[in-house]
Every structure is written in C-alpha cells, then in structure tokens.
Amino acid sequence: MNPRRKSRLYLAVVVLIGIGLTTTLVLYALRSNIDLFYTPGEILQGKGERHEKPEIGQRLRIGGMVMPGSVKRDDKTLEMSFKVYDARGAVTVTYTGILPDLFREGQGVVAQGVFAEGNTINAKEVLAKHDEKYTPPEVKEAMKENHTRPAEAYNSTAAQGNAS
C-alpha cells in the first residue's frame, strides 16, 4: 500500500471514530431529557408487544382522565394527589404546586414527572387539557380508547395493578 493511500485510510478511520464518538456523547447528554409517554394502562400492564414497564426513577409523561372523587389536597401545604385513568387502569399522581385553572375531575390531563414505587408518578408539571385542538398526538391516540365507563369501574383495576 502506498503512503498516500495509507494516510487517506487513517484519515477516514479517524473521521468515522470521531463521528461515532460525537454521536454517542450527544445521545448520552440528551438521555436525561427524554421523557417517554405512557397511559395508565401501559404503566400497569406494560407498553408494546414486550410489555415494557417503566423503571422506578424513570422520567416520563402520563396522559389520561382525572378520576372523579380521587383528588386529595393537603390543607396546610400545596401537596395533592389524584388518580389518572384510562380504559385499562388507574395510576396515582402526586404533585406539589398550583394546578392549572382548567384542572378538574373528569378532564384530560398530562403529567410530567418521575415514576415511583407503588405505581405512583411524582409530577413536576401538570397540564390540563382544555381543547381538542391542543391535545398532543400521543394523548389523542390514548384518548380514543373507551372512557365512558364510570370511574368506579377503574378502582378495582387500579387495586389489581398496585398489588402486582
């Protein structure tokens, strides 16, 4: 192999290694900013064909309906909890702060936070659904499922999910 061809080969290898290293570092840096979207049923029963459940401490977003009668507020602090449900189950969300004005029981909601033990989401942000136009696509897909059953029907599903 002549020296000119050898130096080009070395240069090509170095460039490919540099691109690979740069891509790896960028993906590693962005990893902490990736929040996967789940519905309550996907948290309880797993997501996709492999039924992957979120790990404790994983950042995620959850979308569903606020279960009527589930909102509990602490009178002395801004802490509160409520259940978010879909056709496949219900999950408890805890939040500290002031809720959006449009937050109501029976309304659509998206909460962003960290998955904790007991199928609980410790939310850092809660967004209330206010108009069909502003619903994120993944929430719109999740909401196509049947939400017409009474909220009481989901309490037994949530209890089963918390027991596992």
From Swiss-Prot:
GO cellular component: plasma membrane
Topology versus the membrane: Single-pass type II membrane protein
Record flagged with keyword Lyase: no
Residue numbers binding heme: 130, 134
Pfam name, any one: CcmE
Region (Disordered): 131-164
Compositionally skewed regions (Polar residues) per UniProt: 154-164
Transmembrane spans: 9-29
Coiled-coil ranges (or none): none
Annotated InterPro entries: CcmE, CcmE-like_sf, NA-bd_OB-fold
Main localization, broad class: membrane
Gene3D superfamilies: Nucleic acid-binding proteins
Keyword Metal-binding attached: yes
Skewed-composition ranges (Basic and acidic residues): 131-150
One record GO biological process: cytochrome complex assembly
Record localization: Cell inner membrane
GO MF annotations, alphabetized: heme binding; metal ion binding
Ranges of the Periplasmic topological domain: 30-164
Stretches of the chain found on the membrane's Cytoplasmic side: 1-8
Keywords: Cell inner membrane, Cell membrane, Cytochrome c-type biogenesis, Heme, Iron, Membrane, Metal-binding, Signal-anchor, Transmembrane, Transmembrane helix
Function: Heme chaperone required for the biogenesis of c-type cytochromes. Transiently binds heme delivered by CcmC and transfers the heme to apo-cytochromes in a process facilitated by CcmF and CcmH.
NCBIfam families: PRK13150.1, PRK13165.1, PRK13254.1-1, PRK13254.1-3, PRK13254.1-5
Family indicated by similarity: Belongs to the CcmE/CycJ family.
Name the UniProt record assigns to this protein: Cytochrome c-type biogenesis protein CcmE
